[in-house]
């Protein structure tokens, strides 16, 4: 029998449209960060609850996966930034040239673009929206407000969670 709930590999936490594209991404939970230039940074945090996990083996596994992917898609498509294991928690930091590289490498759909193009691509927005100013939620936003914002961009990540499809959405200017 399949487990009742599958752990999500990545959760959309933050997106920045600020000029600070060179900043490092520090997170203590699974995070995907789409930079202004389209580069994707991710942090995956996993609790290693078994004694047989080995940092060297994990790093070798990730390095081999990166080498296989970059061999087909170009050297700069995916980069292992850092892998560390501390106090039973593994933290993996990765960099992807494009959202398509993130999707191709992880098998998790990541879309970044204008809301209008997302609608044309078949994404639906049957969810609740919030207004965000200076990184803080300030209220709710209607679908009409979202659809009418020609310059609004969206990041959508689709991952299997608890045996069902779930969309994580964030719109930004």
Give the positions of each predicted feature:
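Sec-dependent N-terminal signal peptides of Gram-positive bacterial secreted proteins and lipoproteins
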Residues: 2-23
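Sec-dependent signal peptide cleavage junction
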Residues: 18-34
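Short, cysteine-centered beta-strand-loop-beta hairpins and adjacent loop/turn segments enriched
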Residues: 23, 49-54, 99-104
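Envelope-exposed proteins and targeting segments
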Residues: 28-30, 36-38, 88-90
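Short amphipathic beta-strand and strand-loop transition segments with alternating hydrophobic
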Residues: 31, 77-85
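Beta-strand elements of well-folded, non-transmembrane domains
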Residues: 32-38, 46-50, 96-100
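Post-signal-peptide N-terminal segment of Sec-exported extracytoplasmic proteins
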Residues: 41-67
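Mature, soluble, non-transmembrane domains
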Residues: 83-173
């Amino acid at each position: 029998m399949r487990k009742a709930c599958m752990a999500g590999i990545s959760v959309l936490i933050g997106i920045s449209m600020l000029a600070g594209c060179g900043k490092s991404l520090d997170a203590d939970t699974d995070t995907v960060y789409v930079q202004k230039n389209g580069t994707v940074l991710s942090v995956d945090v996993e609790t290693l609850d078994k004694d047989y996990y080995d940092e060297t083996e994990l790093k070798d596994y990730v390095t081999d996966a990166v080498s296989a992917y970059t061999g087909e898609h170009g050297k700069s498509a995916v980069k292992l930034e850092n892998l560390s294991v501390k106090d039973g928690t593994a933290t993996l930091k990765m960099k992807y040239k494009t959202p398509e590289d993130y999707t191709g490498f992880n098998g998790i759909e990541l879309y970044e673009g204008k809301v209008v193009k997302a609608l044309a691509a078949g994404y639906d927005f049957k969810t609740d929206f919030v207004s965000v100013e200076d990184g803080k939620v300030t209220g709710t936003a209607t679908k009409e407000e979202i659809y009418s914002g020609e310059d609004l961009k969206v990041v959508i990540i689709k991952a299997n969670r608890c045996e069902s499809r779930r969309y994580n959405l964030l719109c930004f200017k």
